[in-house]
Amino acid sequence: MSLTTQIFVEAVKAHQLWLNNKPGGKRANLSYETVSGLKLAGLNFSRAKMSGMDFSKCNLVGANFTEADLFGADFSYADLTKANFTEADLRGAQFFNANLTEANLHKVDLRHGEVLAVTSDDHQAHDKRKEKTRERQVRMVASNLSEAAMVNAAVSQADLTGANLHNVNLTGANLSKSSLMDCDLTGANL
């Protein structure tokens, strides 16, 4: 279901009040809504309930998702540069062709999530929009993934150059064709 801009703005304003313990505040519950393509850079979605939300093609540069419930959310083609996902629930989340450069994913739960580049051959199977695309990498350059739970996560064709993977649990994770150059893998469970 697609949100109207007015309803979304009202929910975000009420959420900001809730975060600051102000009267009229209400925790955002935007689960299974669609905001595809919107410019949401710098917004604070900390501790919001956003399971299954469609953030595809959104500009989320610098957005804050600390401790947010993003179970099954779709961030395909989103710009998440410098976004903060500290301790967020990202189980089953999709990041097809997303830009996560310098994103903070400290202590996230990304079990069974997918961080993939999609080729034109398998694109239709994964992308509801059925658009044609050329193969691209998911950019996670210099991202902080320390202590993340990435058990059985699909992190195929990702550019993790210089990423902090300190104490990350990658048990069963698929890192095929990913660049791990200059990564800190100290204490990582591979």
Residue ranges of predicted features:
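Tandem repeat scaffolds
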Residues: 2-10, 16, 20-190
